[in-house]
Amino acid sequence: MSRQGAEPKPAWSAVPREIKDEVARVLRSPVSRAERVYGGYAPSATFRLRLTNGRRAFFKASYPAPKGSGVKWVVDVEDRNYRRLASLIAPWAPRFFGSFARLGWHVLLLEDLGPRTMPPWSPAKARRATRSYAEFHKSTLGRALPRGLSRTQHHDFAGFWGELAKTGEIERVASLAHRGKDEAREWIDVVLPVMRQLEDALAKTKPPFALLHFDTRSDNSRLQGGLLRIFDWPFASVGPAEFDVAAYAQGVTAEGGPEPERVLAWYEEVLSLRADAIDASLAGITGYFADRSWKPEIPGLPRVRSFQRRQLKSSLAWAARRFDLPEPRWLAAVAD
């Protein structure tokens, strides 16, 4: 069993018998082996299942969270999205075998996409994954999409820099550099007007829009040949493809992969990007990580803040290059 992470995930032995029996009923076969899966950032119950009939499946579930947990389950939304978006998210999403809710558990049964494939991010892997991601967006760009999906979810990223300046919490961002906080604050003072102007444009981005996954990272995707398989769909929405790819690109870099500029170039081998929409998206994304990186750890989610600080560093370094800003040398002092 491969364990990566510190989230307190339940063992298969902790899954109630009634839940296991219903899994067998939905999948038409009892489970012969359940391998607990780590790798994501939430403590959801996740298992790769081998069935007695030789088939495989993936089990994902929310369950009654322990007292004091900061986890907010969204498995019910993900369930709904797998059902209503099935024709739009294939072949990228795993096949959906069924779901049920009982005893405080909400279970999704999906195609098993196998073990983690990234990181490491080689240039060849990153290019194949990125081109497939572009094909996903291209498949729905400009199409009529379900009305129940948000068209404004990306707007939530349009005001973080402004709010940090207004509340004075921008000092908390600079303090991430510890002894270099004065240098960090000077840099932030220089770039803040640029970031605020660009992030304001995010809510004004015009169509054409596409179906967005809105949370594409290596821990919720697998690369199978030239196809990027993407799971975890609770945040699916409609918006500019540029937002999805900007968030994805800096995440690749944060995990030791190629620089975002290369990722965007590979994406544009399949689908053109609008420079102004990338600019607005990148400003909004950097603001989000600036707002989150200094905050306390979330109970039950022990690795989230660390990964957000890594993404703050990769996204701000990219923004400095893209917007012709001074080099943020202070980022070297920011601990993961």
Stretches with model-predicted labels:
Residues 27-52:
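ATP-binding glycine-rich phosphate-binding loop
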Residues 70, 210-211, 223-265:
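Active-site Asp-x-Gly
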